[in-house]
Amino acid sequence: MSGHGAPEIDLTTLNPAETSQLKLAIVAASWHTQIMDGLLDGALRAAKDAGISEPTVLRVPGSFELPVAAARLAKHFDAVVALGVVIRGGTPHFEYVCEAATMGLTDVSVNTGVPVGFGVLTCDTEQQGLDRAGLPGSKEDKGHEAVTAALATAVTLKQYS
């Protein structure tokens, strides 16, 4: 599994007084409902673990729309998390959407200084998405990981603002 070697970021090691004060937005695509539901559940669980009881959640049609929504949200939030699923088909569309989402979200983060957690699954098969969605039987929980990374980065950056 590609998650081998990933850092272990434990939200409980962060100061709850810091994380609970952060304003968090989650923007989630709508394709591949079962996988997206798992990603969003994991993201909301991570927010709750960090003391953020009600993050703002915005739904968009697909992963291609994530960057523009994240850019708008970054104007009002301390951290943004983007969740989506792109599964390879028989055309180059997969590469175009994956690159646009990845580069767009990177641009949002770099240009605004707001951490954008990358929870976009780019999979060859639906099973790969299910394995990473945080569902019962999944090997990974990428929604939880994306929120954890965004909040840990936001706390770190606040030390230098």
From Swiss-Prot:
GO cellular component terms?
cytosol; riboflavin synthase complex
Q: What positions does the entry give for 5-amino-6-(D-ribitylamino)uracil binding?
A: 31, 63-65, 85-87, 118
Instruction: Give, as in the UniProt entry, the pathway in which the protein acts.
Output: Cofactor biosynthesis; riboflavin biosynthesis; riboflavin from 2-hydroxy-3-oxobutyl phosphate and 5-amino-6-(D-ribitylamino)uracil: step 1/2
Q: Which Pfam families match?
A: DMRL_synthase
Q: Where does (2S)-2-hydroxy-3-oxobutyl phosphate bind?
A: 90-91, 132
A molecular function (GO) term: 6,7-dimethyl-8-ribityllumazine synthase activity
Q: Per its UniProt entry, what is the enzyme's top EC class, as one word? A: transferase
Catalysed transformations (reactions) = (2S)-2-hydroxy-3-oxobutyl phosphate + 5-amino-6-(D-ribitylamino)uracil = 6,7-dimethyl-8-(1-D-ribityl)lumazine + phosphate + 2 H2O + H(+)
> What does the entry give for GO biological process?
riboflavin biosynthetic process
Q: Does the keyword Transmembrane helix apply?
A: no
Question: EC number(s) in its UniProt entry?
Answer: 2.5.1.78
According to the record, the signal peptide region is none
Active-site residues are 93 (proton donor)
Keywords on record: Riboflavin biosynthesis, Transferase
Which InterPro entries does the UniProt entry name for this protein?
A: LS, LS/RS, LS/RS_sf
Give the domain of life. Answer: Bacteria
This molecule's function is given as: Catalyzes the formation of 6,7-dimethyl-8-ribityllumazine by condensation of 5-amino-6-(D-ribitylamino)uracil with 3,4-dihydroxy-2-butanone 4-phosphate. This is the penultimate step in the biosynthesis of riboflavin.
Cited HAMAP family: Lumazine_synth
Family to which this protein belongs: Belongs to the DMRL synthase family.
- Its protein name is 6,7-dimethyl-8-ribityllumazine synthase
Tell me what organism the protein belongs to.
Answer: Arthrobacter sp. (strain FB24)
